[in-house]
């Protein structure tokens, strides 16, 4: 059966998976969602014996039904190969009484690699399937990790160009170096004097500019996105939650059918939405625990049903979560509104014009699978420090947010279900914050000296991505947030 996609802001018009991947954002500004989330057509017993690549095919074939088996397997095998520093792609590590799903073993040492390694292949295949002759210009706003992963994925891919916008001073030093040292004739990096929300809003405005689109089309170009608003980013993220459950089963950490909780450090809401889709596909997930940092707009939303971005934007040690407008939440809003596009438009208009909206009591019922929590900067430091002291395991700042929220949830609710924590970035990406949390004395050392020190204390070898930035040249541009980014 051919699974079609529709916009969250117009339920009448449908497109194929490949068309949704190519467009990125719907013409009406909405996000593409499947008409219905498909069920897995293989059992967990079968999945537990599968490799990551085989699991990816089992999941993606249910969503990307207009791809042939040969096309999809080619995309998967081209993505999940030696670019990852472990054959299992996404290892599960038991840390104390939780299970960390390490999603940072790809080329840019962050979870974005899990989807951005395959997106260029999905996009080029989609272009071929739809007889697209234009070059595809990828526009991406980043709060840190997406930028480098997208640049690495699309670098020198024929028929594409990529422009990444990031907030100057709003990403870690390592994240910035990774982006501005990216090689590739078709890559551009622009720093804006503003925050991530400014960058993301600017990119969305470009997508919605019909005159600009027509002008570019006449010159042989068309826009698409590598942000998680693109369904081609979201679906590959579903895979690792299915894979993780199957591996827990294979390792006899859980019984068949046993429910687990999943905690995800959350900013733009894509990663936790992927876990929600995995649950809808049939993975026995009980609670989806949404972990926020001091920018706790999502925590407040789950507590009250009110989404309010009218608040101070706080720069934290987990910059990929420093977001006040969580774009992917719109997909969940559309779902809990009973796929009512008119209601979605009403709420998104309120968000754009007033910065706030409130969902109905009936919609709030649809959030019962979700729990919100947040960690302060001090709690992040304590979690990194205490986990290292007790177990020897070193985690990055974003993962520490999730680990703290997971532990707090267990303490508050006495829920004894096993908990999976999405470990979203290598500690090497946030080396100063991580090392000074372990011991404040490290603050006196320079970043590259800290990298060597982290290797000693963690036992994690220095990743190639970090070795590369030591010997690369920088290239970047800067924009004020009020300047047009077109």
Segments predicted by a language model, with ranges:
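Well-ordered mid-protein domain cores that form the structural environment of catalytic cofactors
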Residues: 99-156
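Glycine-rich phosphate/pyrophosphate-binding loop at beta-loop-alpha junctions
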Residues: 149-186, 190-200, 253-256, 261-348, ...
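Active-site-adjacent helical/loop segments in soluble small-molecule enzymes
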Residues: 209, 217-252, 258-259, 335-413
């Amino acid at each position: 059966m051919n699974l079609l996609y529709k916009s969250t802001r117009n339920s009448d018009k449908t497109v194929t998976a490949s068309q949704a991947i190519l467009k990125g954002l719907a013409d009406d500004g909405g996000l593409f969602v499947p008409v219905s989330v498909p069920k897995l057509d293989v059992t967990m017993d079968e999945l537990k014996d599968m490799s990551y690549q085989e699991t990816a095919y089992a999941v993606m074939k249910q969503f990307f039904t207009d791809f042939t088996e040969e096309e999809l397997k080619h995309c998967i095998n081209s993505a999940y190969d030696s670019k990852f520093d472990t054959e299992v792609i996404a290892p599960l590590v038991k840390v104390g009484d939780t299970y960390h799903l390490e999603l940072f073993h790809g080329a840019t040492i962050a979870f974005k690699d899990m989807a951005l390694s395959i997106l260029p292949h999905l996009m080029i295949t989609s272009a071929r399937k739809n007889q697209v002759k234009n070059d595809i210009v990828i526009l991406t706003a980043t709060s840190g990790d997406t930028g480098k992963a997208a640049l690495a994925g699309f670098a020198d891919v024929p028929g594409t160009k990529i422009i990444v916008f990031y907030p100057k001073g709003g990403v870690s030093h390592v994240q910035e170096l990774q982006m501005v040292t990216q090689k590739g004739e078709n890559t551009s990096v622009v720093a804006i004097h503003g925050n991530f929300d400014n960058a993301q809003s600017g990119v969305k405005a470009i997508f919605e500019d019909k005159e600009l689109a027509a002008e570019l089309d006449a010159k042989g170009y068309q826009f698409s996105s590598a942000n998680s608003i693109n369904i081609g980013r979201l679906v590959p993220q579903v895979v690792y939650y299915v894979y993780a459950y199957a591996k827990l089963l294979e390792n006899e950490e859980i019984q068949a059918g046993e429910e687990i909780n999943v905690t995800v450090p959350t900013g733009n809401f894509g990663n936790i939405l992927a876990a929600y889709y995995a649950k809808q596909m049939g993975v026995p997930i009980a609670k989806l625990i949404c972990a926020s940092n001091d920018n706790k707009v999502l925590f407040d939303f789950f507590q009250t049903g009110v989404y309010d971005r009218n608040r101070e934007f706080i720069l934290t040690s987990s910059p990929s979560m420093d977001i006040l407008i969580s774009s992917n939440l719109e997909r969940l809003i559309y779902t809990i509104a009973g796929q009512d596009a008119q209601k979605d438009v009403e709420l998104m208009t309120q968000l754009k014009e007033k910065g706030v909206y409130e969902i109905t009591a009936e919609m709030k019922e649809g959030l019962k699978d979700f729990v919100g929590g947040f960690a302060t900067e001090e709690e992040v430091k304590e979690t990194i420090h205490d986990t290292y002291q007790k177990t020897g395991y070193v985690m990055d700042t974003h993962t520490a947010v999730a680990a703290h929220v997971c532990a707090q949830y267990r303490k508050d609710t006495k829920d004894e279900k096993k908990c999976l924590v999405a470990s979203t970035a290598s500690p090497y990406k946030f080396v100063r914050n991580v090392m000074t949390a372990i011991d404040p004395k490290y603050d006196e050392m320079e970043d590259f000296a800290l990298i060597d020190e982290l290797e000693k204390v963690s036992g994690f070898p220095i990743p190639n991505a970090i070795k590369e930035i030591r010997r690369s040249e920088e290239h970047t541009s800067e924009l004020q947030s009020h300047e047009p980014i077109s």
